[in-house]
């Protein structure tokens, strides 16, 4: 007997790549299993026909008849008791195998239709024909344990099929999300490239505008500089012309002034020369002064005439000069009083006066004589 659980024979290593939906069957002729296949345009299930491995030698005809309906998804029990108990087991096994094969083909086609979202008319016609060929097993030939076992296996099969469908749907959703993510990524990259290109174009335009603006400002500054230089040259020429005119006028005035001064000097010279000639003429006829000079000749005082001596003054002040009395300052008086505390002895003061006596001789003019009175 086989081990309890999945109730399936052990597969060789070549059948390990198939999905859980692939089940061994009693007949090695034509079995099918649904394998997820991804194409260029969509995803879905593709029905792959694969020969079932041969059952072990220990399996009898009754065991094959017991295990053959396990892959039948749409298997239903007959409530009416059949009368064909006397038929041979070989015919029953062949009928059950054909029904299981037809039901599996229908399940695979239905799953492919659900996943791909499209069904062909040919598959529908085949399914209708297969549904008509289904043969319900009489319940009288199965024991209660077999009925329970088959129901459990059908539930397990349905659960596994639903799980496979859910996993496949999840894979499809994940793949769709990945495709959408890749699409969004490509769109984002394209938008980023467009944005970068736009920014570069904008920067280039701004740079060109800046360069053009700088060149325009530079040209305007150069034009303004040239205009200012020309204006400055004109102003300088006007100023230079004005200065030259002023310099010429100043030199002209200086020449006129110098000429006038020379004329005045010449006139003064002429007048002075004229006056000198007149004085010289008059001096010849003017009487000489008396000999008022004195000198010693042969040891005797004698008078003689000298033209170098000063003439006798015509007037002199007969009142002798007296110095003005200036009282000493108070501070000096106080300081002198503090320094000398000795009693001052009064001495008789001899009044003297200086009298300027001008001798009548020319030898000692302005002689000071001290006369004591």
Swiss-Prot record:
The Gene Ontology biological process annotation of the record reads: spermatogenesis
Query: Compositional bias (Acidic residues) at which positions?
Result: 77-101
Expressing tissues: Expressed in sperm.
Q: Which UniProt keywords apply?
A: Cell projection, Chromosomal rearrangement, Cilium, Coiled coil, Flagellum, Phosphoprotein
Keyword Phosphoprotein in record: yes
Biased segments, Basic and acidic residues type: 328-337
Q: Does the keyword Electron transport apply?
A: no
Q: Which residues does UniProt assign to the signal peptide?
A: none
Q: Which Pfam families match?
A: CCDC34
Instruction: Provide GO CC annotations from the record.
Output: sperm midpiece
Q: Coiled coil where?
A: 152-286
Polar residues bias locations: 61-76
Positions of region (Disordered) = 1-112, 118-137, 324-352
Q: Where in the cell is it found?
A: Cell projection, Cilium, Flagellum
Disease entry from the Swiss-Prot or TrEMBL record: Spermatogenic failure 76: An autosomal recessive male infertility disorder characterized by oligoasthenoteratozoospermia, and abnormally shaped spermatozoa in the semen of affected individuals. Sperm flagella have multiple morphological abnormalities, including short, absent, and irregular caliber flagella. A chromosomal aberration involving CCDC34 is found in a patient with hamartoma of the retinal pigment epithelium and retina. Translocation t(11;18) (p13;p11.2).
Function of the molecule: Involved in spermatogenesis. Has a probable role in anterograde intraflagellar transport which is essential for the formation of sperm flagella.
What else does UniProt say about it? Antigen recognized by autologous antibody in patients with renal-cell carcinoma.
| Descriptive protein name | Coiled-coil domain-containing protein 34
What organism does this protein naturally occur in? Answer: Homo sapiens
């Amino acid at each position: 007997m086989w081990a309890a659980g999945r109730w399936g024979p052990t597969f060789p290593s070549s059948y390990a790549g198939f999905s859980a939906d692939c089940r061994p069957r009693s007949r090695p002729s034509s079995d099918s299993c649904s394998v997820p296949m991804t194409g260029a345009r969509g995803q879905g299930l593709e029905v792959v026909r694969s020969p079932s491995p041969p059952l072990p030698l220990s399996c009898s005809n009754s065991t094959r008849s017991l295990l053959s309906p396990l892959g039948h998804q749409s298997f239903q029990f007959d409530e009416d008791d059949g009368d064909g108990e006397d038929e041979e087991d070989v015919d029953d096994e062949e009928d059950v195998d054909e029904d299981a094969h037809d039901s599996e083909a229908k399940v695979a086609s239905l799953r492919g239709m659900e996943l791909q979202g499209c069904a062909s008319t040919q598959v529908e016609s085949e399914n209708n024909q297969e549904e008509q060929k289904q043969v319900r097993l009489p319940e009288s030939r199965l024991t209660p344990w077999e009925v329970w076992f088959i129901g459990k296996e059908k539930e397990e099969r349905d659960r596994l099929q639903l799980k496979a469908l859910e996993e496949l749907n999840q894979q499809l959703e994940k793949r769709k999300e990945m495709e959408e993510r890749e699409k969004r990524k490509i769109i984002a990259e394209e938008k980023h490239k467009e944005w970068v290109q736009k920014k570069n174009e904008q920067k280039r335009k701004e740079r060109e505008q800046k360069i053009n603006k700088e060149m325009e400002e530079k040209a305007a500054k150069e034009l303004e500089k040239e205009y200012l230089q020309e204006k400055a040259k004109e102003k300088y020429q006007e100023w230079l012309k004005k200065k030259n005119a002023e310099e010429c006028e100043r030199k002209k005035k200086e020449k006129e002034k110098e000429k006038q001064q020379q004329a005045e000097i010449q006139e003064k010279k002429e007048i002075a020369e004229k006056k000198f000639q007149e004085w010289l003429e008059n001096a010849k006829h003017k009487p000489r002064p008396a000999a008022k000079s004195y000198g010693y000749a042969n040891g005797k005082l004698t008078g003689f005439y000298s033209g170098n001596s000063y003439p006798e003054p015509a007037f002199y002040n007969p009142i002798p000069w007296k110095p003005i009395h200036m009282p000493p300052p108070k501070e000096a008086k106080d300081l002198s009083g503090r320094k000398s505390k000795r009693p001052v002895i009064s001495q008789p003061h001899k009044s003297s006066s200086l009298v300027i006596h001008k001798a009548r001789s020319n030898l000692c003019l302005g002689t000071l004589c001290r006369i004591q009175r």
